[in-house]
Amino acid sequence: MLGHIVSLMKNIVVAGSHGKTTTTSLISSIFSFSKIDPTVINGGVLNSYGNSAKLGKSNWCILESDESDGSFLDIPVTYSIVTNIDAEHLDYHKSLDKLKRSFVKFLNKTPSFGKSFICIDDPAIKSISNKIK
């Protein structure tokens, strides 16, 4: 259901082990300040909205995604962001290498008219950067 809703809009999908909620909040604040009213789906409550989700009036969606169970691979992406990658959720991914491969798949879903943004300072992201198209 979420994937279908998001597919109807231009979207920014934020992934990573840490900083997803903060990054999603910052981007949504920038859009709102710029008078672009995005739909926002966040993992934490946004102080400016008093909620973790908000239906906007523009054709933009800013979404915090969840890599813990691989479901972030099911969400359509226009612009992808990965903040960092740590050895988390290995109960699902089984190893750090498999987790990193999931992030490569996520980033490589970004269409040619979109853009991917990564934190190259993060050692795990740096180690996969040559696999990102």
Question: Where do the language-model regions lie?
Answer:
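Phosphate-binding loop of NTP-binding sites
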Residues: 1-133
